Amino acid sequence: MVDITDDASPAQIKQAIGSAAAHYMQTSIRPNDMVGISSWSSTIRAMVDNLHPLNIKTSGVIQLLGGVGPNGNVQATLLTQSLANILNCPAYLLPAQSIERSTEDRARLISSGEVADVVNKFAEVDLALVGIGVLEPSQLLKIPATITTKRC
């Protein structure tokens, strides 16, 4: 639970939630935990920004969602790697887009070596960090070149 003032801005609310989530994670995570992370959440970004380096080593941080658009993969990589650095562990990056054009494209992608290696690690996740958010798109999805209006 996060206590905020009635006149708190959305940025202040996100900061408060990120700070509380960081505190919870710092007190809950165990050595050798495998952490999965959603890459589209600005609140999770706030949590990572509020974490302090821990004196434990986890098994790894796995990117659970691919990026959307060219900048989406960069953001997902940075968030996953930042958390892995704080947790003193390797980052397992998902080299894929989250949205594919067809189920055939998805099947081809899932069976490719690098993607399959990461997807196979999903079963090892002990703690998954996912943003639930609001109905409107995340600011991370609104970055230019992330979403296009062109129909396929």
Where are these regions (language model features)?
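Ligand-binding beta-strand-loop-alpha-helix segment within the catalytic cores
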Residues: 2-31, 55-144, 148-150
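Detector for methionine-enriched segments
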Residues: 1, 25, 34-37, 47
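Distinct, well-ordered alpha-helical segments
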Residues: 49-53
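Gly/Ser/Thr-rich loops at beta-strand to alpha-helix junctions
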Residues: 36-46, 68-69, 134-136
